[in-house]
Amino acid sequence: MNSVIVEDDPTLIHRFLFHAENKPDALAYCFLEDGEIDRQRVSFRDLREMSTVVARIFSSVCQTQEPVLLALPNDCRFIVGFLATQLESLIAIPVYPPEGKHKRARFTSIVHSSGARVLLTSSEYIKRCSNYFSTLADDGVTVIDIDSLLNGLLLPLPQGVSDVNGTLVPGEVSTKATGLQGAESSVESYNVESYIEPSAKPDDISFVQYTSGSTGEPKGVVITHANLIENQRMIQRSFCHDESTVFGSWLPFYHDMGLVGNILQPLYLGIPCYFMAPIAFIQKPFRWLALISKYRVTTSGGPDFGYALCAKRVKDAQIASLDLTSWEVAFNGSEPVKLATITRFHAKFSSCGFSAKSMYPVYGMAEATLFISGGSRHNEPQALQIDSAELQRGRIIGAAENENSKSLVCCGDDIDRQQVCIVDPASRLPVADGSVGEIWVTGAHVAKSYFRNPELSRSTLAATFDSASDSNADQSQCKYLRTGDLGAVVSGDLYITGRLKDLIVMRGLNHHPHDIEATLQQLDASLGEYACACFTDNIGDVDFLTVVQEIAPTYAKSGSLEDLADKMCEELNQEHGLTLDSIYFVRPFTIPKTTSGKLQRSAMRSRLAENAVTPIWRYLSPRIAPLVTQNGTLEERVSYVR
């Protein structure tokens, strides 16, 4: 392997400048229009020139280590804006643009919690969110239009964006918001050859990753330059990347996997990445595979659902045009990795060169910058067939494949026991090999704080073992990230079993909600197209199981929801020994998710408690219906009692 790593780079921005100096004309990023047309290619020199222009403007309105909001499209402008913050040693805060009620509420929450007074956005978002941005400006936030700064440098412009004098830049908002009326002329006369030398130090904050978690309230994970560059080294080593690596991606830039894994890892290595918009992939999953085939991509991946979507929607006739022999690392993470998905994907695409050894299950999270561990890089994914009943008791016991077993995919091969530990969350002590506990992580890549939230930082990012009972004194002094994930280590390999907060405990047995949800969604092919959330609820001292299932409007009109509810109750009783007391059939996109697509079960539970959901149809068991009527909190929701 040809190494491209310089171990003494103090920060990633220094590494980027090294590439800009030594191979200025090399391709850094290519952006595809509609996931198919090669529209824009950007070299390292281009990136340096454009980011320097924006950084100069930042220097006139920002102090060192001041937070800057980045609400930009998934294209070159996002990367330029991010690099500009790094050049000026500012704190980048990527945030989804405030389009739509939910995103606007999240955006407002991040503005307030971060205390940011500067926002970098684009001309199209200034137009579409003009009233909202004007309100921010009235509150003292400086809103900067990146398109006006890069006029003449960013060519060709993304489709639908005009130049600074075009119709997509509302002058009254732009002028009022930015307070930089003289910025245009200063940029035109600015000599981009007078580059900026970054002052960032390893312990300075590089950016803040806002993650919603299970409750829906954004929390900002502080990523220092030291965290970032250590995680880049970990990714490079584990993925076996070198100077011949070529990336391809459809992941959103605001997601940690998209930013850290697909923008910054190529930048760190000095290699190219080919991007397509997330919507282009969702519309036609074939586009992703065609990109890999056309540009001879070696590393590309995403959540499990992306592979499932390809296996389901790519037509056999399309496969004949693909050549996936270049695809060495097909990373699969961000949500539970399913053996069934891996098997179906390989079966469908092996004929066009996809190797089973390329599939690479990974585990990570924003609090660890991104990457924590991965499976065996040069072997087929490893899976355990385990006894489902023993898993309910917190033990991983091998079993033959049958109706009483389930599969777990390895997401960490030969892990470092000092960095990844399985801990009993009650006693705060490590558990034995093969026992399920909470996954705790430590290392230079792990964040030390949440932005402006010291209490949460102490409880989640600085956990320690119970030193009074721990025989390993050195390890008991370490501070760990409590991931909130449940898992086990078997023969040195890591297996993820679920989320601690989502765990359903009934009659002393542990049930993982995604297992229950998977059982229910197999009852009808149409159910798998939409989200399903399972959790425990309570009225007074009575705990009960609730399922919320999104359904298509056409299904709701068929009049068969009562039969479906009966099937759900019977199936859960037969497969899991559980009584289902409450079912809500709701419209698509009702169940809230995180920005990375994970179900927010706690948030869904809260929405039901607040009567914030109008179900299409609902069922309550005879055990719960009288309590609902007496309690009064859910009385209006009852429409069917069996």
From Swiss-Prot:
Membrane spanning residue stretches: none
Top-rank taxon, per record: Bacteria
EC nos: 6.2.1.47
Range of residues in the leader sequence: none
UniProt record, GO biological process: Actinobacterium-type cell wall biogenesis; fatty acid biosynthetic process
Keyword annotations from UniProtKB, A to Z: ATP-binding, Fatty acid metabolism, Ligase, Lipid metabolism, Nucleotide-binding
Function statement: Ligase likely involved in the biosynthesis of a polyyne metabolite. Catalyzes the activation of decanoic acid, followed by the loading of the activated decanoic acid onto the acyl carrier protein TtuC. Decanoic acid is the preferred substrate, but it can also use 10-undecenoic acid and lauric acid. Nonanoic acid and 7-octenoic acid are only weakly activated.
Protein name: Medium-chain-fatty-acid--[acyl-carrier-protein] ligase TtuA
Species of the source: Teredinibacter turnerae (strain ATCC 39867 / T7901)
Taxonomic path: Bacteria, Pseudomonadati, Pseudomonadota, Gammaproteobacteria, Cellvibrionales
